[in-house]
């Protein structure tokens, strides 16, 4: 497992924003999996973009965390048709506790209460990605 990229921008301090009350937290998640040159090894990368904003008519950014966290997985004895779902559901599920801790630590070290991410439903995320990919493919002519 490894941190590929980590960024924390404390916009509130930089721009003099004073946060009143509970902020709005937006979380975006993207997943990627690639075969490595070593047989049966795969890189799985989880990309998170987390933005905290004030709850106003014109919201202002409080902080932004961007994290790319990866794992190298040796996968054997899995049927070919089950490999992609395994890489995009089970592998991220194994990485998530570490991602959650990093996000919590970074937000706390940035001077804010620790941000404890809710569990991510990787099955739903996978289904959404499959549906989006199917919608982008051109339809055959009748």
Report residues per predicted region:
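N-terminal intrinsically disordered, cationic/polar leader segments
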Residues: 1-94, 98-142
């Amino acid at each position: 497992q490894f941190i590929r990229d980590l960024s924390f921008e404390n916009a509130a301090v930089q721009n003099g924003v004073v946060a009143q009350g509970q902020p709005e937290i937006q979380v975006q998640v993207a997943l990627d999996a690639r075969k490595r040159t070593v047989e049966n090894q795969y890189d799985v990368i989880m990309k998170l973009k987390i933005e905290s904003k004030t709850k106003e008519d014109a919201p202002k950014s409080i902080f932004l965390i961007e994290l790319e966290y990866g794992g190298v997985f040796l996968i054997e004895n899995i049927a070919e048709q089950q490999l992609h779902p395994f890489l995009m559901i089970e592998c991220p599920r194994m990485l998530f506790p570490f991602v959650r801790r990093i996000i919590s630590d970074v937000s706390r070290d940035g001077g804010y209460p620790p941000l404890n991410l809710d569990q991510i439903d990787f099955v739903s995320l996978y289904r959404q990605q499959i549906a989006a990919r199917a919608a982008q493919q051109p339809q055959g002519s009748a």
